[in-house]
């Protein structure tokens, strides 16, 4: 289930032609270029799905503010009612322990989701990716392959297959003078991709990388089948990587220490 998908064409219509100023610092392929477009998406969703739409840190602040008598990280963690969502959305023990009205969470670049949509105990985690289509560039980091493996394991252990989606919106832009101009968008659902085709870049902090517009959406199995298929893919890739690392970095030097 996606709250975004039914209104995606509206989002697409609003975004195409939108201009944001070229960042004064940072690279055009980095966070500085993407953040203004992400803010436009958030603004649209906040205006049209106001009761559902949060930044991840806003949701956590709201969750804890509704239960001010609950203190301590262990008690606050129980508010999630889901080990998988706790893993995906929560902050660390110290930060959760020290949270207060005077010490609210702030946005972190490594939050799992740029935008979180919540309704009837279902969560849609949305990440906004941007792409300079004037240049051929490596696909962006999407999510840690290890973090996704841990997520799949928790889904299976706790039989939590219908609580959340992880989806992506790509904003394609071109540089026009001092402006970045949106020329197209794409939307894709992680759990509709073929797990065995996800590219893991082990040299880039084990990140799964893809362009949203290129992500296959042909998987027709259950969420449990997706999780198990991904774990098989991850383990196979990890085993191959381990063999490669030993062959390259261990075997040539072992004779010197034996």
From Swiss-Prot:
Disulfide bonds: none
Gene Ontology molecular function: DNA binding; type II site-specific deoxyribonuclease activity
Entry coiled-coil feature ranges: none
Reaction catalyzed: Endonucleolytic cleavage of DNA to give specific double-stranded fragments with terminal 5'-phosphates
Enzyme class: hydrolase
UniProt superkingdom: Bacteria
UniProt-listed Enzyme Commission number(s): 3.1.21.4
Keyword vocabulary terms for this entry: Endonuclease, Hydrolase, Nuclease, Restriction system
Signal sequence residues: none
Gene Ontology biological-process entries: DNA restriction-modification system
UniProt cross-references to InterPro entries, sorted A to Z: DNA_rep_MutH/T2_RE_sf (IPR037057), Restrct_endonuc-II-like (IPR011335), Restrct_endonuc_II_HincII (IPR015307)
Protein name (Swiss-Prot/TrEMBL): Type II restriction enzyme HindII
């Amino acid at each position: 289930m996606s709250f975004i998908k039914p209104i995606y064409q509206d989002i697409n219509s609003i975004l195409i032609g939108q201009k944001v100023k070229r960042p004064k610092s940072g690279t055009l392929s980095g966070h500085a270029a993407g953040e203004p477009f992400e803010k436009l998406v958030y603004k649209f969703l906040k205006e049209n799905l106001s009761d559902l739409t949060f930044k991840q840190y806003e949701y956590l602040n709201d969750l804890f503010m509704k239960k001010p008598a609950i203190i301590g990280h262990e008690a606050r963690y129980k508010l999630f009612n889901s080990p998988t969502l706790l893993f995906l959305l929560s902050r660390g023990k110290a930060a959760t322990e020290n949270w207060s009205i005077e010490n609210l969470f702030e946005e972190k670049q490594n939050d799992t989701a740029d935008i979180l949509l919540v309704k009837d105990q279902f969560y849609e985690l949305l990440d906004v990716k941007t792409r300079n289509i004037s240049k051929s560039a490596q696909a962006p980091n999407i999510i840690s392959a290890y973090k996704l493996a841990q997520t799949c394991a928790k889904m299976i252990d706790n039989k939590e297959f219908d609580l959340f989606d992880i989806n992506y919106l790509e904003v394609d832009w071109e540089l026009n003078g001092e402006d970045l101009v949106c020329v197209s968008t794409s939307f894709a659902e992680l759990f509709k991709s073929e797990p065995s085709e996800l590219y893991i870049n082990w040299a880039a902090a084990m990140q799964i990388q893809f362009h949203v517009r290129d992500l296959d959406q042909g998987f027709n199995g259950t969420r449990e089948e997706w999780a198990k298929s991904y774990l098989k893919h991850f383990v196979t890739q990890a085993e191959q990587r381990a063999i490669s690392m030993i062959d390259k970095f261990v075997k040539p030097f072992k004779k010197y220490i034996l």
